[in-house]
Amino acid sequence: MILRFIRSCIRIPGFLLMSWFYVLALLLIRLLKAHDLKQLHGVLLHYIRNVYRLMGIRVEVQGKLPDEPSIYMGNHRSYVDAVLVPAKHPIVFVARSESKNWPIIGWGASLLGTIWVNRKDPASRKNTREAVKDRLRNGLGIVIFPEGTTHIGPDLLEYRPGMFYISAEGGFPITPIALEYQDPSIAWVGQSKFIPHAWKHFGKRYIDIKVSIGKTLTGKDGGQLLKTAHEWTAKEVLKLRKEWDS
């Protein structure tokens, strides 16, 4: 218990300070080289590696990443998920507009070019579609969690269909991804407060996760793309859960 307390005391303030440093680095790049995607992505990758080291995150990746930019769609368990999606190309996220004003994390996400979606705005789908086209044409991958919220699992919530139809209309490839933590309680769900939840889990020596990458999907039928991605991810998550429990 004492070691867990000490780790939490070091890790959480350390994470906030480190994140603030990287936000400043992103801001500097934006000011000096606004369109240098490689440098922005390099900062993100460097940040993720240091988050792993500081927070004791260990990731096992199964499967092969696509060679071309893709829309990566995964199940959603926790706030940790955002640093778990590997990519060969610079990536941006699709996220709820409510997260845009989060101190430090929201600011950094905006500097990386995150596509903010306002679900209450009727024009949101059109704006999102154009933003996705723009990012993919510029060689960026897109990361989205189509459940729309976190869920403890191991089952999946229904996927929100919007991005699948945008993908079908634009001919954008989709790569399904399955995430499963060794400890299911790391899922951030319900009315859990962030600080108590983070304090509990970042006090552990390690946080172990399996990430499985599926085959890239293309097609003109958004409903079929959704069905195929959801079915594969649901089966793969159950397989990963069995691996952890065996």
Name every feature range the model reports, one short phrase each.
Residues M1-E60, W107-L111:
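A transmembrane-helix-recognition feature enriched in membrane-embedded lipid enzymes
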Residues M1, E60-Q62, P154, G162, ...:
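Soluble, non-transmembrane catalytic domains of enzymes that act on hydrophobic metabolites at membranes
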Residues I104-G106, P154-Q224:
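A cross-family acyltransferase "interaction/gating" segment
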Residues I115-L136, G141:
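A membrane-cytosol interface segment of integral membrane proteins
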